């Protein structure tokens, strides 16, 4: 797959932000913005490796109209083939915009 740095997430289903094999390089940070007018949302940001989940953040509330920047620069997230996927899960179908800052 091809790496995509920007995502609009609107579902409670776990979504891949970066899939294993995307070769996204070093992921320095993940910017999460709750763009809903009135509702808060809880967010999980997950590294998945070979079916095992490792939480970067779990059940963190992002109030409506605010953002959270997660620094991942010190984490060894390897998105080459058969390695790590970066995933997101929302507590409700509240729209969250995601921007991934990476360096190849």
Please provide the spans of the model-predicted regions.
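Intrinsically disordered, low-complexity Pro/Gly/Ser/Thr-rich segments with frequent PxxP/GP/PP motifs
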Residues: 51-84
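C-terminal interaction-tip segments
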Residues: 1-25, 29, 35, 81-83, ...
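Generic preference for flexible, low-structure residues
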Residues: 43-48, 70, 78, 102-104
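Short, surface-exposed beta-strand/strand-loop-strand elements in extracellular ectodomains
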Residues: 37-58
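Glycine-rich nucleotide phosphate-binding loop and flanking beta-alpha elements
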Residues: 38, 76, 94
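Ser/Thr- (and often Asn-) enriched beta-sheet segments in non-cytosolic proteins
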Residues: 14, 42-44, 59-61, 69, ...
